[in-house]
UniProtKB/Swiss-Prot annotation:
Membrane topology: Single-pass membrane protein
Record-annotated membrane-spanning stretches: 53-77
PTM notes: Phosphorylated on serine; O-glycosylated, but not N-glycosylated.
Superkingdom in the source lineage: Viruses
Leader sequence residues: 1-19
Protein name in UniProt: Early E3B 14.5 kDa protein
A Gene Ontology biological process term: regulation of signal transduction
Amino acid sequence: MKRIVTFVLLIFCALPVLCSQTSAPPKRHISCRFTQIWNIPSCYNKQSDLSEAWLYAIISVMVFCSTIFALAIYPYLDIGWNAIDAMNHPTFPAPNVIPLQQVIAPINQPRPPSPTPTEISYFNLTGGDD
């Protein structure tokens, strides 16, 4: 698998270098939107040696190859659903640590009164358990 990845990366790195030596750079226009691939041939003044069909075929093959390549390397990446141990911290709380100073309640203090209930009972309104 490492050989295939290295070979594909080498091809993708060498391809622009080889293509730039054989052709002149095209003129750029501000109105070119590369998200609309059907407008790519009309963005440049210089006509290409390849027809539009070849251009679309090359783009389609590159999209297909990159999709296959991405699906091939996805199981080896620790992202998304594959990231089982992405967070290397325990899911359970840490064990209790003994504090340096224990809080001790005074011995002779009376208990604080219980808080008043937030609801009024029916029996409190009627006068008891009659």
